Amino acid sequence: MEIMSVEVSEGFNEEGLPDFKYYAFDWDDNLMYMPTEIMVKSFGDQEIGMGTADFAEYRGKIGKEDFDYKGHTIVGFAENPFRNFGVDGNDQFVKDAMIAKTGPSWNDFIECINGGSIFAIITARGHNPETLREGVEAIVKDGKGGLSFESCVESLKKYKGIIDGDGEELFQEYLDLCRFHPVSFGAGSAANPEEEKIKALEQFIKHVNSLSEELAVTMELENDIKNNFVPMIGFSDDDKANVDNVKKYLDDKGEENVNVYYTKTDKTKM
């Protein structure tokens, strides 16, 4: 398998028409380096907070073998280890998102939002989906790291006949079309999210295909366009296990319209 450094393009083509590029983003350590911690247990039953990047490295060991971590011997998970990532942490999520450092896929997120492209957030977190939406809305309206509510609205106005209304209405309708998948919400597992992320991506692919078909018909009717409209999705994640499982799933299905990007170090296409 060839691996190359790439950037995801998006938005409108040279004719000013939608280019049918869509995005699916993991959240933690991909879009942002959130301060939220998983709680693990050390020898002596002391609770130790573990960041998401470290958890991606150590999660295969937790509860299976003891290991040293920041001067402690970790023997397993603490009680309710993902408490900060679930509904109990809903309010804190938005606050953390406002102050968190941006991650390796942030520039793509800027292009996606400012260009009015449809996206999905597919994360191992277990917050209410509405909480993820509120977080995105808050950082866009705050102008975090180059995001622009005004640019997003101007891009959405190019979709006349597809979405209409004033700026706030356009933006809310836009978010209605996007998807927010906290895969450990409800019965999902934050410790082993790979299969749930695949299910979420599969749902987003179906959603994108449906949107693209509707958009293609509209553009053909309004502009007498006879091109082949093929949607392309870029999925990015910093967790190698998630990336490998998604890549295998797509290869097994023969899905050629989804590009998978591993973002742990340099952003690479798998």
PLM regions and their residue ranges:
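Extended hydrophobic secondary-structure segments that form protein cores and membrane-embedded regions
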Residues: 22-25, 120-122, 232-238, 261-263
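Conserved Lys-Pro-Asp/Glu-containing loop-to-beta segment of HAD-superfamily phosphomonoesterases
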Residues: 21, 197, 201-240
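Short beta-alpha junction loops
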Residues: 125-127, 239-240, 264-269
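Alpha-helical substrate-recognition element adjacent to the catalytic core
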Residues: 3-6, 11-191
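C-terminal accessory extensions appended to soluble enzyme cores
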Residues: 1-10, 92, 230, 244-245, ...
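Short, surface-exposed basic-aromatic patches at helix termini and helix-loop junctions that form
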Residues: 111-114, 136-144, 206, 227, ...
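Short helix-terminating capping/connector loops at secondary-structure junctions
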Residues: 16-18, 112-117, 147, 215-230, ...
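Acidic, divalent-metal-coordinating active-site segment for phosphoryl/phosphodiester hydrolysis
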Residues: 238-250
